[in-house]
Amino acid sequence: MPRDDDLRQHIAQQLSSFEPREATGDPLREAAVCVVIAHRADEPVVLMEKRAPSLRAHAGQFALPGGRIDAGETPQEAALRELHEELGIAASADAVLGRLDDFATRSGYLIRPFVVWAGDVLDEVVLNPAEVAVLHEITLPQLDAEPRFVEQRGLGEPVFQWPFEDYWIHAPTAAILHQFREVVLHGRSTRVAHFEQPKFAWK
């Protein structure tokens, strides 16, 4: 896998060949998230948060930087604003390399994911303790792990899970990361919007 400027160009090229799908149907509350690529000792990593335990919704769950889209702002503007508010990373529109598929959650949100190149910013990251408990750095070999589908009582479809360290991460976060892996690492236009979420994420 190429690194630095070559890696950035590779990711941008893979995303330019991918046609993201926008969700249709009943209107949902809109949110935007960032799949952030940064560097740790010259190794590319993707950033994933564990949400603060004090949050009213999805406390303690794994998530990508992001949040609700405010009135008057575009999804991309919202994604970059939330990235700055949660992690202190100030990224411009030029840092956005592309988009992934919209993901409609069981909790009533329509998530619009953007892929953002952050580069050498990890030493400058400042976690917002009101929103973020822990920041995880996912290496590309870790990202390239095989997921699994697990039956859950009361659901018609198996739940999608992706392995990270000692955890199993669920959709929507796992689904978005899996699609990033498929598109960027393997050049596959794998769709993930149908991946089921566990019941605890429905609230």
Walk through the language-model features, giving the residues of each.
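N-terminal leader/linker segments that precede catalytic domains of diphosphate-processing enzymes
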Residues: 1-63, 67-85, 89-124, 161-203
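NUDIX/MutT-family hydrolases
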Residues: 127-167, 199
